Amino acid sequence: MDYYQWRKKNRRRKRNLQTKKPLNYALKLLKYRVRFEDELRERLKKQGFADEEVESTINTLKKQGYLDDEKAAYLFALDEMRLKLFGPRVVRMKLKSLGVDEEIIERAIEKALEEIDFHEELKRLKGRFKDRWELRDYLYRRGFDPSLIEEILNKIDGGEE
């Protein structure tokens, strides 16, 4: 084995040792996107780390501010509502399926609803539909509450006149 092969082999071994640590693996996962506590716990356990190591890693990340379910839920709700135009009902179901606490979900959705202006988004969308009923059905399927749909449609219709 020549020097270059030996060096390559040692680099690979060193890299494997570094990624075997649960904290390094968790930080690697968090580098790509914000994750929820339960989601990260499952990923670490699936990787084969012991329960004590997983809990210690999660506590460390919480203390350092890398892991915050409330912030993650808010960012998730904001993205789903703003970019994918999902309503609160669908966002609530998605967050529940990710294992987020009910109180955190409600606060995140309220905060996201305060920040988003659906009226401008839906004004552009209105041209795709023949009439008001089609748009109403579309919004209901996307997870908007009937009262919110009526409020939005009234503002859109009021703004055109």
From Swiss-Prot:
The cellular location(s) given in this protein's UniProt record come to:
Cytoplasm
Gene Ontology cellular-component terms listed: cytoplasm
Give GO BP annotations, semicolon-separated. regulation of DNA repair
InterPro entries, sorted = RecX_HTH_1st, RecX_HTH_2nd, Regulatory_RecX, WH-like_DNA-bd_sf
Q: Which UniProt keywords are listed?
A: Cytoplasm
HAMAP family recorded:
RecX (MF_01114)
Please describe what this protein does.
Modulates RecA activity.
Know the name of this protein? Regulatory protein RecX
**Name of the gene this protein is made from:** recX
